[in-house]
Amino acid sequence: MLILLGYLVVIGTVFGGYVMTGGHLGALYQPAELVIIGGAGIGAFIVGNNGKAIKGTMKAIPLLFRRSKYTKSMYMDLLALLYRLMAKSRQQGMFSLERDIENPKESEIFASYPRILADAVMLDFIVDYLRLIISGNMNTFEIEALMDEEIETHESEAEVPANSLAMVGDSLPAFGIVAAVMGVVHALASADRPAAELGALIAHAMVGTFLGILLAYGFISPLATVLRQKSAETTKMMQCVKITLLSNLNGYAPPIAVEFGRKTLYSSERPSFIELEEHVRAVRNPNQQQTTEEA
């Protein structure tokens, strides 16, 4: 929604300001310039990326127009889930989690948090490392190094669509110049025409430079920034899981471990200490929480 609002602001201010100076919008309508700039940009995108990158970019574009699912309440659910898993392992032993991690969809603990279940990346990250911890064949430092490696791989993969769009955005001003030069060449080839017609041809040629810059910095490049922001949110969730599980492995009690995880979150979504404490207390005493809700 914000993207569409931003586009409207760009269009309204740029073209509105042009009209205020006495310009005619019809002079800016040059389909041939759009074909040159857009076609060259798409071609450069295809040339500069392999099939996997192109597919990933196409898959990422619809995500731009969806609201972020990583809200404060989802972070609370994540920390509550981790708390319940760690508390169960403390009370019943690590092997008590085997059924939960082998089939999370049938686990009573995981089923209480459908948003985590629906996030395949996050679910796999949690389950895979709990499985490694249960195996007992790796120490804390090895697990931390493996987590860092996976998070780094995730970041690299998430950067591909953003970099692809950024490359297209960076190329559009140059393709606008190409379109403008071609228009100037056409105008110079028509030098025998009256001055009024020649001036119109040169004006049409200059539209190419205008469109290239506008499309690049007003429409395409901002999308790359949004993609990076969205991928950073997923990375932050993974870092939260990492810090929480490692804290538990280092001997901290589950309430302290989730506090470690809370401190890694962005301030805009981070619950306060009191909020998290009350949420954890509700998880400890579900019957009390249900009675309160019914009252």
From Swiss-Prot:
It is found in: Cell inner membrane. Residues 52-170, 223-295 are cytoplasmic. Residues 22-33, 192-200 are periplasmic. One of its GO terms (cellular component) is plasma membrane. It is a multi-pass membrane protein. It holds the Pfam family MotA_ExbB. One of its GO terms (biological process) is bacterial-type flagellum-dependent swarming motility. PROSITE patterns: MOTA. Keywords: Cell inner membrane, Cell membrane, Chemotaxis, Flagellar rotation, Hydrogen ion transport, Ion transport, Membrane, Transmembrane, Transmembrane helix, Transport. InterPro entries: Flag_MotA_CS (IPR000540), Flagellar_motor_stator_MotA (IPR022522), MotA-like (IPR047055), MotA_ExbB_proton_chnl (IPR002898), MotA_N (IPR046786). The chain crosses the membrane at residues 2-21, 34-51, 171-191, 201-222. Each stator complex is composed of 4 MotA and 2 MotB subunits. 2 A subunits and 1 B subunit are thought to form a single ion channel, so that each stator complex contains two channels. Belongs to the MotA family. MotA and MotB comprise the stator element of the flagellar motor complex. Required for rotation of the flagellar motor. Probable transmembrane proton channel. This is Motility protein A. It comes from Salmonella typhimurium (strain LT2 / SGSC1412 / ATCC 700720). The lineage of its organism: Bacteria, Pseudomonadati, Pseudomonadota, Gammaproteobacteria, Enterobacterales. The gene is motA.
